[in-house]
């Protein structure tokens, strides 16, 4: 398509800009399981393996002071957040309008499930899994969590452009709490949308679970096996993760975001985390996240994968920080939204961004291990037969894994003209 070709040209032109030299470039990059531009797995999507990265400098402007909070409206440009959602959808699908892009996304999802040409249907429920991990009650938390402006931008897009009725949408964080700044902003605009969290009350609904809904592919000890009914009863799911690091696994992106759908305690210290961490020497092993990614009620229902990168963070907790010095951010917040129809490809791009900006992130070595397993789930390097429902039907490849060539050009195989691997489509707001 002509539009797609124009986008590709723009991407290549932007990616060849020189990179500013800064101190952290001397830091040795984390070790990874996969070498650059050596894709494995089967790409997914309308345009296979495509990841759309939208960048709107100035969308997030918090200065780090205590006089304001990162989530305040004064520190976030809602108009730019809406642009990020619209641009991501357009570039992901190749469509010229947001409305047509949604239609293409719904049609692709249903066609993959044997319902050729079907778009969104009347009464079909959508559950959105956000990452509000750093919350302790309904009171506002200054730590990094889901952005109220970005979430509202997505909800507006779903209601006004995709035509999804408010009562068919659920925003869920079953393992934690939906704080006031998030709930109040979104509920005041769309009072018909349901909000589900760990405790309920104050307008939120308390999470309920379908016990034993996930049967892990290997013995996972006392790891929670219940799944929130917000997801088991949904027809579609949207995974809206954050762009940040995490101790143990190196990163927390879309793959780990599923953990919050399980019947765990709001106090993380009381929960099991079996087979979350990669082997420190890079030896392949069974990874729990692959079971989440391939489960019929989680990854199997996912319409769209998103990574909210308004405030990308080096660490899992605390206030957002530090600012990003790499190109194209140049000392600002990343002010980005990343989207894909391929659950493996999107997290690979997230890893490449995080480890390029923060090469000294804790536990970043081999942080791509769960994605290498997911990309080759039908013939996993660890030898695991992934079957998250335990019904004797093993998973096949869940998507394509690949690292970009370098942090300067940021090109994947399809950006280099090959018919394999990932294609990264970047657009910067003018």
Q: What residue ranges belong to the model's regions?
A:
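Extended, low-polarity segments enriched in aliphatic/aromatic residues
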Residues: 25-122, 133-141, 145-153, 159-430
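Sec/Tat signal peptide C-region and signal peptidase I cleavage site
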Residues: 19-23
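Positively charged n-region of N-terminal signal peptides that target proteins for export
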Residues: 1-8
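Bacterial N-terminal signal peptides
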Residues: 9-18
């Amino acid at each position: 398509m002509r539009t797609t070709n124009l986008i590709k040209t723009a991407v290549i032109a932007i990616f060849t800009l020189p990179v500013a030299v800064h101190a952290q470039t001397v830091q040795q990059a984390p070790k990874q399981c996969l070498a650059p531009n050596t894709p494995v797995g089967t790409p997914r999507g309308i345009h296979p393996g495509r990841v759309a990265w939208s960048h709107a400098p100035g969308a997030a402007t918090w200065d780090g002071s205590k006089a304001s909070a990162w989530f305040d409206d004064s520190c976030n440009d809602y108009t730019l957040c809406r642009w990020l959602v619209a641009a991501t959808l357009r570039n992901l699908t190749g469509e010229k309008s947001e409305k047509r892009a949604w239609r293409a996304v719904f049609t692709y999802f249903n066609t993959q499930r044997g319902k050729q040409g079907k778009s969104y249907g009347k009464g079909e429920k959508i559950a959105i899994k956000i990452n509000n991990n750093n919350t302790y009650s309904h009171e506002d938390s200054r730590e990094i969590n889901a952005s109220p402006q970005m979430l509202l931008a997505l909800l507006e897009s779903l209601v006004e452009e995709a035509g999804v009725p408010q009562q068919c949408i659920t925003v869920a964080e079953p393992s934690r709490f939906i704080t006031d700044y998030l709930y109040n902003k979104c509920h005041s605009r769309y009072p018909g949308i349901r909000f589900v969290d760990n405790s309920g009350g104050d307008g939120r609904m308390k999470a309920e679970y379908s016990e034993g809904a996930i049967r892990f592919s290997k013995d996972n000890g006392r790891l929670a096996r219940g799944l929130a009914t917000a997801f088991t009863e949904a027809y579609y799911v949207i995974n809206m993760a954050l762009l940040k690091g995490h101790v143990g696994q190196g990163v927390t992106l879309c793959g780990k975001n599923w953990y919050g759908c399980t019947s765990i305690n709001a106090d993380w210290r009381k929960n099991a985390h079996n087979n979350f961490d990669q082997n420190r020497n890079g030896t392949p092993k069974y990874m729990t996240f692959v079971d989440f990614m391939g489960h019929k009620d989680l990854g199997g229902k996912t319409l769209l994968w998103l990574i909210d990168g308004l405030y990308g963070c080096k660490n899992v907790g605390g206030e957002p920080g530090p600012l990003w010095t790499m190109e194209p951010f140049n000392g600002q917040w990343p002010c980005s939204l990343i989207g894909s129809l391929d659950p493996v490809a999107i997290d690979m791009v997230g890893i490449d961004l995080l480890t390029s900006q923060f090469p000294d992130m804790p536990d970043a070595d081999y942080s791509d291990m769960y994605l290498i397993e997911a990309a080759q789930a039908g013939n996993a390097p660890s030898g695991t037969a992934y079957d998250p429902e335990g019904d004797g039907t093993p998973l096949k490849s869940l998507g394509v894994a690949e690292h970009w060539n370098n942090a300067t050009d940021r090109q994947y195989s399809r950006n280099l003209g090959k018919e394999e691997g990932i294609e990264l489509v970047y657009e910067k707001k003018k």
